Amino acid sequence: MPTINQLVRKPRKSKVEKSDSPALNKGYNSFKKTQTNVNSPQKRGVCTRVGTMTPKKPNSALRKYARVRLSNLIEVTAYIPGIGHNLQEHSVVLLRGGRVKDLPGVRYHIVRGALDTAGVNDRKQSRSKYGTKRPKA
């Protein structure tokens, strides 16, 4: 416990809150070629690499991911949710925040059913999360 005098001389510092998805908080001014502070819920980007990676222990799988260059020129790793996908290099995708707990360094999700990303086929439940249209009755 500090004394009152110690707190008067050097007050407590408030914690600086850090963003969970920092690439969504940056914009790019192409005229000045500078980064700007713009908060966005999603960002558009182009896939530079699509592949699979293995999760941390104790899980075992081949998780699909894409390396994406965003419209603000930041390159990030994003998870491709759902079973099967149609993404390849140069596909234009929409990114949202949200990490994948068992993949280190993956802090973003690709939005299914937006831009070049197709929705998941034959999905009956939680369709809106996977960009699947309502099946014909």
Swiss-Prot record:
GO terms under biological process: translation
Domain of life, per lineage: Bacteria
Annotated GO MF terms: rRNA binding; structural constituent of ribosome; tRNA binding
Record key words, sorted: Methylation, Ribonucleoprotein, Ribosomal protein, RNA-binding, rRNA-binding, tRNA-binding
3-methylthioaspartic acid carried by residues: D102
Keyword Iron-sulfur: no
GO cellular component: small ribosomal subunit
InterPro entries reported in the protein's UniProt record: NA-bd_OB-fold, Ribosomal_uS12, Ribosomal_uS12_bac
KW Flavoprotein (keyword) present: no
Residue segments, region Disordered: 1-55
Compositionally biased spans, kind Polar residues: 27-42
Quaternary structure (record): Part of the 30S ribosomal subunit. Contacts proteins S8 and S17. May interact with IF1 in the 30S initiation complex.
NCBIfam families, alphabetized: rpsL_bact
HAMAP family assigned: Ribosomal_uS12_B
Family statement drawn from the similarity comment of this UniProt entry: Belongs to the universal ribosomal protein uS12 family.
Entry function: With S4 and S5 plays an important role in translational accuracy.
Protein name, per record: Small ribosomal subunit protein uS12
Species in which this protein is naturally found: Enterococcus faecalis (strain ATCC 700802 / V583)
